[in-house]
């Protein structure tokens, strides 16, 4: 297996403790019979293409990528990212399958999803669990793993990915009325790093280490990107609104969680009586 690399800005960095095999490598693929069959017949891709016609998925050889992944543990993780950050990437759908029969709470390695302006959701990497999401639409990361973690991922391309409406932010999108649209549009990627500025920073440190050369370079690149966007006063004002909405959403969610805990405690007291 090869060391995994992450694209951040214009450079690529090696992630500690993460290794992978790209099944486009025929010699390696032929050593994994079942994965070779999966890659050659692409039945799952064809089935998804039938079930999701609106995505106009492709099922030809060059449009499908399958990677096997081994996380050694020792804190191995992924920083916040989209699987499709923009042109010329064609990825449309991500399908992750987890292969961890003995996973338990505390082992780490959860997939953490960040639906735009909503509360994050943690997905446990349990054996045979399949997670499917839009490559160009869902911000996510992998939390630090403290035990070996195995999975494979299928990415499927589409020729309609990254249209002009998906990549070009306009003045009409910088208003409250545009928020419902942004929640369901890949255009949210343009604003992602400024809205989730702190989350990006923490995820980089978690992945690359606090004072490593790679983390310093990635943090500097991230900061430069954020500042370049915030130089536009209209963007800066709208981002402040989005951050407030995100904070309020999380505060409301935390209050509901606390309320649920109080109800459970009250129920326990009644049971004890």
Task: Show where each model-derived region lies.
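Transcription-regulatory cofactor-interaction regions
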Residues: 184-192, 196
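Catalytic core of non-heme Fe(II) oxygenases with the double-stranded beta-helix
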Residues: 34-170, 269-273
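Non-heme Fe(II)/2-oxoglutarate
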Residues: 1-52, 169-172, 177, 181, ...
């Amino acid at each position: 297996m090869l060391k995994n690399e992450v694209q951040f800005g214009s450079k690529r960095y090696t992630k500690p403790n993460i290794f992978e095999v790209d099944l486009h490598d025929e010699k390696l693929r032929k050593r994994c019979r079942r994965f070779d069959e999966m890659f050659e017949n692409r039945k799952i891709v064809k089935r998804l293409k039938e079930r999701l016609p609106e995505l106009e998925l492709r099922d030809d050889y060059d449009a499908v990528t399958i990677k096997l992944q081994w996380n050694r543990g020792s804190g191995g993780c992924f920083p916040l990212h989209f699987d499709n950050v923009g042109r010329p990437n064609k990825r449309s759908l991500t399908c992750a399958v987890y292969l961890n029969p003995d996973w338990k709470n505390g082992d780490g390695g959860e997939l953490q999803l960040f639906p735009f302006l909503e509360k994050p959701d943690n997905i446990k990497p349990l054996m045979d669990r399949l997670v499917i999401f839009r490559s160009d639409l869902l911000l996510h990361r992998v939390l630090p793993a403290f035990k070996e973690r195995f999975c494979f991922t299928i990415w499927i391309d589409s020729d309609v990915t990254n249209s002009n409406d998906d990549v070009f932010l306009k003045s009409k999108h910088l208003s409250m009325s545009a928020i419902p649209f942004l929640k369901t549009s890949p255009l949210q990627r343009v604003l992602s790093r400024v809205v989730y500025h702190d989350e990006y920073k923490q995820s980089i440190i978690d992945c690359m280490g606090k004072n490593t050369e790679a983390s310093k370079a990635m943090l500097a690149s991230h900061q430069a990107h954020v500042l370049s966007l915030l130089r536009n006063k209209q963007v800066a004002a709208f981002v402040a609104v989005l951050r407030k909405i995100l904070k309020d959403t999380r505060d409301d969610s935390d209050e509901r969680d606390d309320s649920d805990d109080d109800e459970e405690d009250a129920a326990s007291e009644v049971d004890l009586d």
